[in-house]
Design a protein with these regions (language model features):
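Glycine-rich SAM-binding Motif I of class I
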Residues: 63-67
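Conserved SAM-binding motif I beta-strand of class I
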Residues: 76-81
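Conserved class I S-adenosyl-L-methionine
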Residues: 52-61
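S-adenosyl-L-methionine
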Residues: 19-53, 84-117
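Active-site capping/gating segments
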Residues: 153-195
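Central antiparallel beta-sheet cores of small beta-barrel/beta-sandwich binding domains
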Residues: 188-282
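Conserved beta-strand signature within the Rossmann-like core of class I S-adenosyl-L-methionine
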Residues: 144-155
């Protein structure tokens, strides 16, 4: 008879193994479906891949997208793929196309891979996995990083561009010829509370700027300690920040650039113009 303590340890071990297997299965981001070459071409064009880019393909399969980025645009690239046989196939393809010095293929979980180096991210994953990546993209990727998602949007994030096309050869692969590409530019992280400084001619007192930033919306208000004044039509694209403000009857237009915990730029109003600065305090 197996002692109770040993049986309990064995049961715990089996449970842990089963849990690990379940977690690994949960992170298999869909079956391998090769992207037709015409779509590879359009994804690279939409991302405006350049020689100074580092292109990450999450779920890279046979590596064709990363290899094409290196061969056609001299970009560097990283492919992340869970299946070892596909990783080896991609490495062989890189050697054959003479770009092995510019690309690397990593066997690993794309949900745990460090992606901070990327300036371009490509993905062709099932919707539930795409949505899991949205918080990571917004939190970890540098402002200005471009993302192209094949067929599935990064909900609830709104794309900067969309491209639709009919690709007959895709029907034999995935059952449909209709293709959609979604293009995103990672915005600077501007949410929080800021000390806002304006020219004295526009605001004589210190102001507080409070910004709320979500994947599908950004906005906020300015407070002088007594009254709140809401921002108008705020947009954040890469590091570029724009918004309007009606402050005590004076309509002002702000343009600027975010850099970490500081922002600065120009402000215009009928009564004058000048520069503005902001420093994040929390």
């Amino acid at each position: 008879m197996i002692p109770r303590s040993v049986a309990a340890a064995l049961a715990l071990g089996f449970a842990s193994h089963a849990l690990a297997q379940a977690e690994a299965k949960d992170n298999i981001a869909g079956p391998y479906v090769p992207t037709p070459w015409v779509i590879v071409d359009e994804m690279l064009k939409l991302a405006d891949v350049r020689a100074d880019d580092v292109v990450y393909d999450l779920g890279s399969g046979d590596g064709r997208l990363v290899i094409a980025a290196a061969k056609r645009y001299q970009a560097r690239g990283v492919g992340v793929e869970l299946q070892p046989e596909l990783v080896e196939l991609a490495r062989s393809g890189a050697k054959k196309e003479d770009v092995a010095d510019r690309v690397k293929f990593v066997q690993g979980d794309l949900f745990e891979t460090d992606i901070r180096e990327a300036s371009v991210v490509m993905l062709y994953l099932l919707p539930q996995f795409v949505m899991r990546l949205v918080p990571r993209f917004l939190a970890e990727l540098r402002p200005g990083t471009r993302i192209v998602s094949h067929d599935y949007p990064l909900l609830p994030w709104r794309p900067d561009k969309e491209l639709s096309m009919d690709v007959p050869e895709k029907e034999f692969i995935s059952g449909t010829s209709w293709t959609r590409l979604f293009y995103y530019v990672v915005p600077a992280r501007v949410g929080g509370v800021w000390d806002l400084s304006l020219p004295k001619a526009l605001a004589g007192a210190p102001l507080m700027l409070q910004i709320t930033q979500e994947p599908d919306a950004v906005g906020g208000l300015v407070s002088d300690g007594r009254d709140d004044f809401y921002l108008r039509d705020m947009t954040v694209r890469a590091e570029q920040v724009r918004f309007g403000l009606l402050y005590k009857g004076r309509l002002m237009a702000f343009e600027g650039k975010a850099a970490g915990d500081t922002m600065s730029g120009s402000v215009r109003a009928r009564s004058g113009s000048g520069t503005w600065t902001a420093r994040r305090v929390k």
